[in-house]
Design a protein with these regions (language model features):
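C-terminal structural cap/anchor segments
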Residues: 308-387, 393-396
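Residues on the lipid-exposed face of transmembrane beta-strands in outer-membrane beta-barrel proteins
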Residues: 37, 63-69, 126-130, 164-168, ...
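Outer membrane beta-barrel
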Residues: 68-100, 112-194, 217-225, 313-321
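Transmembrane beta-strand segments that form the barrel wall of outer-membrane beta-barrel proteins
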Residues: 41-43, 137-151, 176-178, 215, ...
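Solvent-exposed loop/turn segments connecting transmembrane beta-strands
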Residues: 151-158, 184-187, 207-209, 231-242, ...
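Repeated loop/turn-to-beta-strand initiation elements of outer-membrane beta-barrel proteins
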Residues: 35, 75-77, 134-138, 173-177, ...
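Beta-barrel outer-membrane channel/assembly domains of diderm bacteria
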Residues: 16-144, 363, 388-393, 397-403, ...
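Outer-membrane beta-barrel translocator/channel fold
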Residues: 88-90, 177-199, 206-211, 254-335, ...
Length: 441
């Protein structure tokens, strides 16, 4: 494990640059600053249905202070963002590893040496930023949301990444980005770690990389058509190309959204050679595979919307000898896939998945802030020993956000999921969240 000094260095550099300019130029730095205090109460319960195992149960309260500065005046503006967060355990789910227990801690809090969840933990993310014209560079803590890398926020505290990113919007309708990620702070940790993938992220031969390079472009060809290309490279593990198309078609009655995605992934560095794979630079994958990254994934999703209703149907196909490669340290991930379920991801070697969903926004009948969503995944042909495996998952969620009055800023969410299959755990899961956000200035 590594303690991240990158964010602290970025903060000192940005703050030093800001203080070095005249006080008049610092006016916008302060005037355009914003700060928000957020609270998040989170409960999760997981029940394994096909094994004699204790249920996993945890409950906690988190506090977030999100400060975003403006930029100093002048051709080149400097700024500083700070995201401080702290989590307190309300119920840790007992003690892991104890015999004859009915419940055990999950993955919300780091574990003490005695198997109990820590009483509390936290971290501070700091990001220095620089702006020139319509181009912005950021150094320090990042929360990426790109096809090749998405941060995960599925527990009490979010996953953080640490590195550098530059984004340019100099050309109308075209957004360009590029950067490098060196470490991540997992959602149940206060420390930073190197990067890895499924198959190499645990055990005595676990291997990690501190070099994830990315670049991408989003082009708004028309007001209804978005074209995307992204590239990601986790050194010594994989190279990945992504092509995407999103089109909104306004029909005489309702609208139809088309979402097409294609990923091509290949081996890189030590994963390319047998000697490197012998060191542990391997990917999970099909039965009998060498551990070399070899994956193609394409999907199509169509969503018809009308008067608050949204009906979706999609299909995803995975081919190649390896599972879909992505940064994965084993404590939670979010993927830019139409099969990014609450529990499973449906991205194993050979897997074919049908997706069907229904969502309703109650604003259509005069209840703004209330939304529901039901989605079902069915995957088969998973390449496994002996025979092809299959799995399915059902997700349901309901969200409500208070729109006005003294409770404005309060939100509630219930997420329910069930997954079954012949290649893993049969699991039922419930998550409850109560959130509150208060702008300070």
């Amino acid at each position: 494990m590594h303690k991240t000094l990158l964010a602290q260095g970025a903060a000192l550099s940005a703050l030093g640059a800001a203080l070095a300019v005249p006080s008049v130029a610092q006016a916008e730095f302060i005037k355009d600053s914003k700060a928000t205090l957020s609270l998040k109460n989170f409960y999760i319960n997981q029940d394994v249905r096909n094994q004699d195992a204790p249920r996993s149960e945890e409950w906690g309260q988190a506090f977030f202070l999100d400060y975003k500065s403006g930029f100093t005046e002048g051709p080149v503006g400097f700024g500083l963002d700070v995201l401080a967060m702290h989590a307190i355990r309300l119920d840790g789910g007992g003690r892991s590893g104890k015999a004859d227990i009915e419940r055990t801690p999950g993955g919300m809090f780091p574990l003490e040496s005695n198997g109990k969840g820590k009483t509390d933990f936290g971290r501070v993310g700091v990001t220095g930023k620089l702006r020139f014209s319509k181009t912005e560079a950021r150094l320090g803590t990042l929360l990426p949301k790109m096809p090749v890398l998405v941060y995960n926020d599925g527990r009490l505290l979010p996953q953080l990444f640490h590195g550098a990113q530059i984004t340019s919007n100099e050309i109308d309708n075209l957004s360009l980005t590029a950067g490098k990620i060196e470490h991540s702070t997992e959602r149940n940790s206060g420390d930073s770690h190197g990067l890895s993938i499924g198959g190499a992220n645990s055990g005595s031969r676990a291997q990690f990389s501190n070099e994830f390079y990315f670049a991408g472009a989003d082009y708004k060809a028309t007001k209804d058509l978005l074209l995307q290309y992204y590239y990601g490279n986790l050194r010594d593990f994989y190279k990945q190309h992504f092509f995407g198309l999103v089109h909104d078609w306004k029909l005489p009655v309702g609208s139809l959204k088309t979402d097409l995605r294609y990923f091509y992934s290949d081996s890189d560095g030590k994963n390319e050679s047998a000697s490197g794979r012998a060191e542990g630079y391997v990917s999970s994958g099909a039965d009998g595979s060498s551990g070399e990254v070899d994956n193609n994934l394409w999907s199509a999703m169509f969503t018809y919307s009308l008067a608050g209703h949204a009906l979706s149907l999609g299909y995803q196909k995975v081919s190649g000898d390896s599972d879909f490669p992505h940064i994965n340290l084993g404590s939670g991930r979010t993927l830019h896939l139409i099969t990014n379920g609450q529990i499973g991801k449906f991205a194993s070697a050979g897997e074919n998945t049908w997706v069907a969903g229904y969502a309703y926004d109650f604003a259509a009948i005069g209840v703004p802030g209330l939304k529901t969503k039901l989605i079902y995944f069915s995957g088969d042909d998973i390449d496994a020993a002996g025979s092809d495996n299959k799995e399915w998952e059902r997700n349901f969620r309901i969200d409500y956000a208070v729109q006005s009055g003294p409770l404005k800023g309060v939100g509630f969410a219930w997420l329910n999921a069930a997954t079954r299959g012949n290649d893993g755990r049969d699991l039922d899961e419930n998550r409850l969240m109560l959130t509150y956000s208060l702008p300070l200035f």
